[in-house]
């Protein structure tokens, strides 16, 4: 499992004093209010202030004191140590842990690897790339087992649930 988890991406500058606008990669933006530090390119940075906006977060990060400096951080990921992440309820997983999981069906046939997790509102959908691309709804009727340690996701055979 990855030691660091991405919680946001710097998408723009905000103002002239070095604040950055962050697109959250977490389900709960309020978590940013509790963050004391993040890692950018592996370097620890202290968070000095946090303002929540409807779809973004504005952060003042130590060492970023001008719009020019803030501009250098565009498209950079903000990461936290896994040990500082929220504790997930049983049956929930971090997207970072699902990416690159091998997907097999209950008969042992290789389907491919999870390349992305699409958030749809009602349920997640796993984008699985193999011989072809398959979109797998992440629901209990289809996904029968997730083994993060062994990077394996087991699903019901495609012919049972997939329309031709």
Swiss-Prot record:
Its main location: cytoplasm. One of its GO terms (molecular function) is ribosome binding. It is found in: Cytoplasm. Residues 90-161 form the PRC barrel domain. One of its GO terms (biological process) is ribosomal small subunit biogenesis. Signal peptide: none annotated. Gene3D superfamilies: PRC-barrel domain, RimM. Keywords: Chaperone, Cytoplasm, Ribosome biogenesis, rRNA processing. GO terms for cellular component: cytoplasm; ribosome. InterPro entries: PRC_barrel-like_sf, PRC_RimM, RimM, RimM_N, RimM_N_sf, Transl_B-barrel_sf. The keyword Cytoplasm applies. An accessory protein needed during the final step in the assembly of 30S ribosomal subunit, possibly for assembly of the head region. Essential for efficient processing of 16S rRNA. May be needed both before and after RbfA during the maturation of 16S rRNA. It has affinity for free ribosomal 30S subunits but not for 70S ribosomes. Binds ribosomal protein uS19. The PRC barrel domain binds ribosomal protein uS19. Belongs to the RimM family. This is Ribosome maturation factor RimM. It comes from Clostridium botulinum (strain ATCC 19397 / Type A). The lineage of its organism: Bacteria, Bacillati, Bacillota, Clostridia, Eubacteriales. The gene is rimM.
């Amino acid at each position: 499992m990855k030691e660091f988890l991405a919680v946001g991406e710097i998408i723009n500058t905000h103002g002239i004093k070095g604040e950055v606008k962050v697109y959250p990669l977490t389900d709960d933006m309020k978590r940013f209010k509790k963050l004391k530090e993040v890692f950018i390119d592996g370097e620890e940075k202290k968070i000095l202030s946090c303002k929540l906006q409807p779809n973004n977060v504005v952060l003042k990060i130590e060492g970023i004191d001008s719009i020019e400096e803030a501009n250098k951080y565009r498209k950079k990921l903000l990461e936290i140590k896994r040990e500082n992440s929220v504790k997930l309820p049983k049956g929930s997983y971090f997207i970072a842990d699902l990416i690159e999981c091998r997907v097999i069906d209950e008969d042992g046939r290789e389907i491919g690897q999870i390349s992305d997790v699409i958030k749809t509102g009602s349920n997640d959908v796993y984008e699985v790339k193999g011989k072809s691309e398959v979109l797998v709804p992440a629901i209990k009727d289809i996904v029968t087992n997730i083994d993060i340690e062994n990077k394996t996701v087991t699903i019901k055979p495609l012919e049972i649930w997939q329309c031709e």
